[in-house]
């Protein structure tokens, strides 16, 4: 089976990377915020990012063609993805990042299966987010 990869800026993602990110996204919703308004904004950004990734994954899987397929991510999408990856790695490593994540065993198992992808993506998204304007 041919591996499909897509380039996001200077980050190339395969299907397993997209699946890992999608698996981690729900954790970003549990990160505390300073205000209810900020929490609402974060939830909206998370929902938009999740929809983009799921739509992209669905269209890529169904097409199975070599034709170029583009996903357009905004700076907010990159931030959401990086937060989700960071949260997932913290959960898997037991690292305290100031948030008591509520996660069931099934979700933890799914994250564990994707640990390698998440760990590999983390430095790339960190560097990308560090370059984004405030």
Give residue ranges: language-model regions:
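Positively charged, low-complexity terminal tracts
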Residues: 1-134
